[in-house]
Swiss-Prot record:
GO terms for biological process: cell wall organization; peptidoglycan biosynthetic process; regulation of cell shape. The active site is at 92 (proton donor/acceptor), 204 (proton donor/acceptor). The gene is murI. The lineage of its organism: Bacteria, Pseudomonadati, Pseudomonadota, Gammaproteobacteria, Enterobacterales. NCBIfam families: glut_race (TIGR00067), PRK00865.1-1 (NF002034). This is Glutamate racemase. SUPFAM superfamilies: Aspartate/glutamate racemase (SSF53681). Keywords: Cell shape, Cell wall biogenesis/degradation, Isomerase, Peptidoglycan synthesis. Substrate binds at residues 28-29, 60-61, 93-94, 205-206. The keyword Isomerase applies. It catalyses: L-glutamate = D-glutamate. It comes from Salmonella gallinarum (strain 287/91 / NCTC 13346). Pfam families: Asp_Glu_race (PF01177).
Length: 283
């Protein structure tokens, strides 16, 4: 089916009738959340998915905590007013570290967050050096340091915060090539270490989109660890045990916050991920 572009004032075309399915919102500031959505969809292909991305305020890594909390709650509320939700996944590490309490207080449906996969990385490392690749905001958050103290206190944690990697991942999904030299420059602090990390936590949902390029630049044998599969399993459990009975027969839909040329360029990509329409969400 051809992907359809719609503004908020355009009525959504009727979806092909199907069995009612639980409705799951996957939210990110950009397109990185598609990496999490893809893991969930592999495990749970028969759900009604809504993907929302905040291309007005992207990237969140440079925004204040207060702004992020208010913004995420506002967007989730706007989606919930259109589709009763069974569950929401905040597929953004930066937003997850600050907005989950407010979301869980406001909404009755379960809210799943994304946290850096430090615990499994600490188990996998052979040389005891674990790299955390994230946004600068995630690197600085007390929550991240609490995870390290709890699960990786016997490891050396090399943290690297980068907003540029987020931009590179977004550009790649728009069809641009990724400069390996640029990646080497960003990763230089690790590449210059006498003993670089043998296990790297991808602490931003954008970074799995750069997996192939990162493996070309990092030392041979480096393991890359992310939270996608664990989030999918958690989503499945919550839908079975705790989620409200909010079902829909509608087709999957994506929401942006502004219908920009960049958003329009995402149409073929969103189609490949199974979203039939892209609409502007008025917030």
């Amino acid at each position: 089916m051809a992907t359809k572009l719609q503004d908020e004032n355009t009525p959504c075309l009727a979806a092909t009738p199907s069995e009612p399915r639980p409705t799951v919102l996957v939210f990110d500031s950009g397109v990185g959340g598609l990496s999490v959505y893809d893991e969930i969809r592999r495990l749970l292909p028969d759900l009604h998915y809504i993907y929302a991305f905040d291309n007005v305020a992207f990237p969140y890594g440079e925004k204040s905590e207060t702004f992020i909390v208010e913004r995420v709650v506002e967007i989730a509320t706007a989606v919930q007013q259109r589709y009763p939700l069974s569950l929401a996944v905040i597929a953004c590490n930066t937003a997850s570290t600050v907005s989950l309490p407010a979301l869980r207080e406001k909404f009755a449906f379960p809210v799943v967050g994304v946290v850096p996969a430090i615990k499994p990385a600490a188990r996998l490392t052979a040389n005891g050096v674990v790299g955390l690749l994230a946004t600068r905001a995630t690197v600085k958050r007390p929550y991240t340091h609490e995870l390290i103290a709890r699960f990786a206190n016997e490891c050396q944690i090399a943290m690297l915060g980068s907003a540029e990697l987020v931009e590179l991942a977004e550009a790649k999904l728009h069809g641009d090539s990724v400069s390996l030299e640029e990646l080497r420059r960003i990763l230089r602090p690790w590449l210059r270490m006498p003993e670089p990390p043998d296990t790297v936590v991808l602490g931003c949902t954008h970074f799995p989109l750069l997996r192939d390029e990162l493996l070309q630049v990092l030392p041979e044998g480096t393991r890359l660890v992310d939270s996608g599969a664990a989030i999918a399993r958690r989503t499945a459990w919550l839908l079975e045990h705790e989620a409200p009975d909010a079902k829909s027969t509608d087709a999957n839909i994506a929401y942006c916050m502004a219908m920009t040329p960049g958003a329009e360029q995402l149409l073929p990509i969103l189609q490949r991920y199974g979203f039939e329409t892209l609409e502007k969400l008025p917030v």
